[in-house]
Amino acid sequence: MRLYLSSYRLGDSAGALLALVGNGARAAIVSNALDHIPAAAREAYRAEISDPIADFAALGISAQDLDLQHYFGAPDRLENALRGVDLVWAMGGNSFILRRAMAQSAFDTVITELLAHDAIVYGGFSAGAVVATPSLSGVELMDDPNVIPPGYDPAVVWEGLSLVDYAIVPHFDSPHPESVAARAMANQLAKRKTPFRALRDGEVIVHIGKISDTKELAL
């Protein structure tokens, strides 16, 4: 299992990501964590601030968008799509919306199987990293679990993907609007004695191997 979990965007260790995916890699970008934001605002952000497709192209990675809504109730089609790429990259946004999308498309089941066979790399930042953990408990201090875009199941999915065995707090002590909320989440996890990793923007976790037998680097 190969994971690249970042606090913000690609982080400061893109070379480690390239080492995971290899030369000439193909990536699928999952942006469903932003489905509560109007399309025009999302397009303006990509045009004016950050375009993940361009960011990956600068690394020699060919990327395209993968909208999980197109695969709601169609796990076989989703698996076929994911088998055609080397990396799936989950963008930041609302962690609960992203987790709903992963449940309704069966991404959670498909990605676990592909990772178990080392057929793909899972990467993501902020919400994309948070959902890789065992539980989203505490994340409600950073993201609103009751924001429900059209077409989404209103039930909150609290279970994470359990790709790692600890919680992740992004934007910790960082120049980011959610830094104060991140501190509150970290404090709550510490009070509950829940294992967690707090990541500052720029920091990443590179995870190689099974959870029980893993090589992990905090970069």
Please identify what each model-predicted range represents.
Residues 1-3, 60-61, 94, 137-143, ...:
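N-terminal start-of-chain detector that recognizes signal peptides
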Residues 18-20, 42-44, 102-105, 136-140, ...:
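Short, glycine/charged-enriched secondary-structure capping and boundary segments
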Residues 100-103, 108-174:
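Class I SAM-dependent methyltransferase SAM-binding "motif I" and its flanking Rossmann-like core
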Residues 1-96, 186, 190-219:
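Extended, subdomain-level signal for the structured scaffold at the beginning of enzyme domains
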Residues 159-202:
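Conserved anion/nucleotide-ligand pocket segment
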Residues 82-91, 114-128, 175-188, 219:
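A short, terminal or domain-edge coil/loop segment
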Residues 14-15, 39, 99-101, 132-135, ...:
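Short glycine-/acidic-enriched loop or helix-start segments at secondary-structure transitions
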